[in-house]
């Protein structure tokens, strides 16, 4: 029997607000344990929460960006459960009246576009963190308590691990473009739980699902879903029954293991939080949030193609990250050459970022400086080879490309007399290759070009070299 996989994702997106969701404590990641905490975080007697307005605005932005219906009136609820890293004994969340519902995310796949429906987006606060890797004891860090989250719940519309990964990547791209989260999965800014089931191809009823946690990369999301689906099929075909439960993904062993029985909504005894007033979204906020929406990747890529004339592939790569697209556009404004700019951004810039584990905002060469370098190439002042040398120097030096070229004596040589003299010396020193070329082995042309560039330390104008070399070889 053939089976199809059915996947729905629950994604927790940590917002990059300065303060927490319901108090003034810092929401910064990486502080010393138990230092970003106050009576509100711990729900001490008499401490009252106040909802951070920025959290509501970010929720509305994400709702608009994902084609959701925005609730003009929603309520905060208490989700009651016991866990050592939840000192309140409950988590402030939303249940019956979420702020956003019934949305859609369009995901581009190799085989075409996939539309993934959203059940809801709701506001909630994060819990603390249990630390198990210090000796034999378990420690609790409550810094994360109260950090604002948006939970994005999809319908079970995905049918393969790759679709789930692509959906998650698209969601990450959206929150980063909006500027509401850094989307860092390794630091927990974007956490994903997958609900996985299988059913016979053609069936309309869903199978029993299991929830998978602890997937901290797109690759692990794919691996975990693939493993769990295979496990389901093996259990079913072996005559067993799938137990509805929560399972933990073990990235070292590449397997899931049982964590606990899957809870139902009634297990959490949700009820409206009596300390918080309803969340109201008026026309003014809706208008402001719409005005603040950025130009999204698909629209920006289309504009880059039509306005700058770069290939659709280049535009797609450059617009994956908003900051990279900003960098490219600023570079073009200086260089005046969009195609050369896209080549440099996709080539040397992205290579350097990858090698040095940098984000574009950490890159030493600002777009104005890169644009200046590209402008020198276009003007014939330096060759591409020299430009790469200058590019490396610019990463350690705050001088402009033009200043470096002058200081290091790297200006391109276009003097026909000097180039012709160098070529004649090379031909005299390589008589055997010269005879072979004139006997029909024309691929040696590249050999002579290389010899000339080497002799002139890469500073010879390639166009002039080619013209003079061809004239002398054919003489």
UniProtKB/Swiss-Prot annotation:
Mind telling me which Pfam families this protein's record contains?
A: GatB_N, GatB_Yqey
- InterPro entries found in the cross-reference section: Asn/Gln-tRNA_amidoTrfase_suB/E, Asn/Gln-tRNA_Trfase_suB/E_cat, Asn/Gln_amidotransferase, Asn/Gln_tRNA_amidoTrase-B-like, GatB, GatB_C_1, GatB_Yqey_C_2, Gln-tRNA_amidoTrfase_suB_CS
Stored SMART domains:
GatB_Yqey
Q: Would the keyword Ligase be found if you checked this record's keyword annotation?
A: yes
| Cysteines joined through disulfide linkages | none
Question: Gene3D superfamilies given for it?
Answer: 1.10.10.410, GatB domain, N-terminal subdomain (1.10.150.380)
- Quote the catalytic activity from the record: L-glutamyl-tRNA(Gln) + L-glutamine + ATP + H2O = L-glutaminyl-tRNA(Gln) + L-glutamate + ADP + phosphate + H(+); L-aspartyl-tRNA(Asn) + L-glutamine + ATP + H2O = L-asparaginyl-tRNA(Asn) + L-glutamate + ADP + phosphate + 2 H(+)
GO molecular function terms attached to this record = asparaginyl-tRNA synthase (glutamine-hydrolyzing) activity; ATP binding; glutaminyl-tRNA synthase (glutamine-hydrolyzing) activity
Keyword terms of this UniProt record = ATP-binding, Ligase, Nucleotide-binding, Protein biosynthesis
Q: What is its EC number?
A: 6.3.5.-
Q: Which domain of life is it from?
A: Bacteria
State any GO BP term from the record. glutaminyl-tRNAGln biosynthesis via transamidation
The role this protein plays is: Allows the formation of correctly charged Asn-tRNA(Asn) or Gln-tRNA(Gln) through the transamidation of misacylated Asp-tRNA(Asn) or Glu-tRNA(Gln) in organisms which lack either or both of asparaginyl-tRNA or glutaminyl-tRNA synthetases. The reaction takes place in the presence of glutamine and ATP through an activated phospho-Asp-tRNA(Asn) or phospho-Glu-tRNA(Gln).
Family the UniProt entry places it in: Belongs to the GatB/GatE family. GatB subfamily.
Record note on quaternary structure: Heterotrimer of A, B and C subunits.
Q: Read off the NCBIfam families from this record.
A: gatB (TIGR00133), PRK05477.1-2 (NF004012), PRK05477.1-4 (NF004014), PRK05477.1-5 (NF004015)
The protein's name in its UniProt record: Aspartyl/glutamyl-tRNA(Asn/Gln) amidotransferase subunit B
């Amino acid at each position: 029997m053939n089976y199809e996989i059915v996947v729905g994702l629950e994604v927790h997106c940590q917002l990059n607000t300065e303060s927490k969701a319901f108090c003034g404590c810092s929401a910064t990641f990486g502080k010393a344990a138990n230092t970003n905490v106050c009576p509100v975080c711990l729900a001490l007697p008499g401490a009252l929460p106040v909802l951070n307005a920025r959290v509501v605005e970010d929720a509305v932005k994400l709702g608009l960006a994902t084609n959701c219906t925005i609730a003009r009136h929603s309520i905060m609820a208490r989700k009651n459960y016991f866990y050592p890293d939840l000192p309140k004994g409950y988590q402030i969340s939303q249940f019956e009246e979420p702020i956003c519902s019934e949305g859609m995310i369009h995901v581009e796949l190799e085989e075409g576009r996939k539309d993934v429906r959203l059940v809801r987006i709701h506001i909630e606060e994060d819990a603390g963190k249990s630390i198990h890797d210090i000796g034999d004891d378990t420690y609790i860090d409550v810094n994360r308590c109260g950090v604002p989250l948006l939970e994005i719940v999809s319908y079970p519309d995905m049918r393969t691990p790759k679709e789930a990964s692509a959906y998650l990547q698209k969601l990450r791209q959206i929150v980063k473009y909006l500027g509401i989260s850094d989307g860092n999965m390794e630091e927990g800014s974007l956490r994903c739980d997958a609900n996985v089931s299988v059913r016979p191809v053609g069936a309309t009823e869903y199978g029993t699902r299991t929830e998978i946690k602890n997937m901290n990369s797109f690759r692990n999301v794919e691996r975990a879903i693939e493993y769990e689906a295979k496990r389901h099929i093996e259990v079913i075909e072996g005559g067993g029954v799938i137990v509805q439960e929560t399972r933990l993904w073990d990235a070292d062993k590449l397997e899931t293991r049982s964590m606990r029985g899957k809870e139902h909504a009634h297990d959490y005894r949700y009820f409206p939080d009596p300390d918080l007033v309803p969340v109201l979204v008026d026309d003014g906020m809706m208008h402001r949030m719409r005005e603040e929406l950025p130009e999204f990747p698909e629209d920006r890529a289309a504009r880059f193609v039509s306005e700058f004339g770069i290939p659709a592939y280049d535009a797609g790569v450059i617009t994956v990250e908003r900051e990279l697209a900003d960098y490219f556009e600023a570079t073009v404004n200086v260089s005046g050459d969009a195609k050369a700019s896209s080549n440099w951004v996709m080539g040397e810039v992205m290579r350097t970022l990858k090698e040095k584990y940098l984000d574009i905002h950490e890159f030493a060469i600002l777009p104005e400086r890169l644009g200046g370098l590209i402008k020198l190439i276009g003007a014939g002042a330096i060759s591409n080879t020299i430009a790469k040398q200058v590019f490396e120097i610019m990463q350690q030096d705050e001088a402009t490309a033009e200043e470096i070229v002058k200081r290091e004596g790297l200006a391109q040589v276009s003097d026909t007399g000097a180039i012709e003299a160098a070529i004649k010396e090379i031909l005299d020193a390589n008589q055997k290759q010269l005879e072979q070329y004139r006997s029909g082995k024309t691929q040696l042309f590249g050999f002579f070009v290389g010899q000339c560039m080497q002799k002139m330390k890469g500073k010879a104008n390639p166009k002039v070299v080619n013209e003079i070399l061809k004239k002398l070889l054919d003489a």
